[in-house]
A protein has these predicted regions:
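Non-catalytic, surface beta->alpha helical segment in thiol-disulfide oxidoreductase systems
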Residues: 64-106
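Structural micro-motif
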Residues: 52-60, 72-77
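Local sequence-structure signature of Cys/Sec-based thiol-disulfide redox active-site neighborhoods
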Residues: 1-31
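Acidic pyrophosphate-coordinating catalytic loop
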Residues: 46-52
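Thiol-based oxidoreductase modules, predominantly thioredoxin-like and allied folds used
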Residues: 34-46
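Short, well-ordered secondary-structure micro-motifs within conserved domains or adaptor modules
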Residues: 38-41, 57-61
């Protein structure tokens, strides 16, 4: 089983990256996967554009955003990220997306 690389891109001041990290860690334990988790601090709008940052937190597994379709987006922004959720919106990605991305990467 391979060891996936998980990047959690965030900026100081947005509180959701810790919850996103906890989500990734919880799902990794469930799947018995040991990802390399890197926290990537995005310092400003210029870095946001360079890193193709869709907001904080952005979770990527092996370079791909866990949100389906997000890799095609171009609305890079230095702001908190809002994810579509079953009941409105959430400040972290859907657990199913994270599970799917980690499973695929570890295979």
């Amino acid at each position: 089983m391979r060891r996936p690389r998980v990047e959690i891109l965030y900026f100081d001041g947005c509180p959701n990256h810790e919850a996103a990290r906890a989500l990734v860690e919880r799902i990794a334990v469930e799947l018995r996967v040991e990802p390399q988790i890197d926290l990537v601090d995005v310092p400003d709008a210029a870095a946001a554009a360079q890193l193709r940052f869709l907001g904080s937190p952005t979770v990527r597994v092996d370079g791909r955003d866990v949100e389906p379709g997000a890799d095609e987006r171009g609305d890079f922004v230095f702001a908190c990220r809002v994810y579509p959720a079953e009941r409105g919106f959430s400040g972290q990605p859907d657990a199913g997306w994270v599970r799917e991305a980690l499973s695929r990467a570890a295979a």
